[in-house]
Amino acid sequence: MPAEPLSPQEVEERLATLPGWSLDAGRLTRSYRLGSHFAAAAMVVHVAQVQEELDHHSDLTLGYHTVALAVHTHSAGGAVTEKDVELARRVEDLAAGHGAH
């Protein structure tokens, strides 16, 4: 069963619980700064593991000391769904362990 798109109000309510996340071009987005390129790469691997577990994948970008994510649900016509919010929450939970801010 495809995920249902969240309404604009629901997206705003979910974003209020996800500090640092925003809506950009219809996708949930967040950038993290880390202490080193190695720490950023380790976080990318950890995020990839979570994405595989959830069977939901973001656009994930590794920079010099940064990691950036952008996510929406393709099966919902590119809308934001609870799947995106769950991925964002899981990434937030693991980010601190990598020293991300």
UniProtKB/Swiss-Prot annotation:
What's a Pfam family in this record?
Answer: Pterin_4a
Q: Give its E.C. classification number.
A: 4.2.1.96
A GO BP entry: tetrahydrobiopterin biosynthetic process
| Reactions catalysed | (4aS,6R)-4a-hydroxy-L-erythro-5,6,7,8-tetrahydrobiopterin = (6R)-L-erythro-6,7-dihydrobiopterin + H2O
Q: Which UniProt keywords apply?
A: Lyase
- Which enzyme type, at the first EC level? lyase
GO MF assignments = 4-alpha-hydroxytetrahydrobiopterin dehydratase activity
Stated family: Belongs to the pterin-4-alpha-carbinolamine dehydratase family.
Q: Which NCBIfam families does the record match to this protein?
A: PRK00823.1-2
The identity of this protein, by name, is Putative pterin-4-alpha-carbinolamine dehydratase
Source organism of this protein record = Streptomyces coelicolor (strain ATCC BAA-471 / A3(2) / M145)
Its lineage opens with: Bacteria, Bacillati, Actinomycetota, Actinomycetes, Kitasatosporales
